């Protein structure tokens, strides 16, 4: 799981999180797909992380986004699985939107985001979690 600062390409996005907390599902050097857990309420984040630690991916589809590596501002903070329980409760989500014809970004409340995510909460991506050649031994063993 990673934390980072992100400046989205906003042409098609109604809003985005400037400080995502992302479980990466697929990656290439130019982009990656991942589940931003900030789109979920803290209580639902706990359930998602519990499943991840059990070796299961069970994530609402609306949390999954494409991130361009060229739009990351700074470094990716790689979080060990032992830190996930703490990281999901940090109140660092910052949703913003751009308004056509206006300069700057406008805040978009997390409560509105959570409400929208709740509407499609049961449309989920499910898979077995696989860790290859990375992480601690127990993470790799758990995923087998």
Locate predicted features:
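Short coil-to-beta transition motif at edge beta-strands of beta-rich domains
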Residues: 1-13
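Basic/aromatic-rich interaction segments and small domains that mediate binding to polyanionic partners
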Residues: 12-51
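Intrinsically disordered, low-complexity, charged/polar segments
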Residues: 40-144
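Intrinsically disordered, low-complexity segments enriched in small/polar residues
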Residues: 2-4, 21, 31, 37, ...
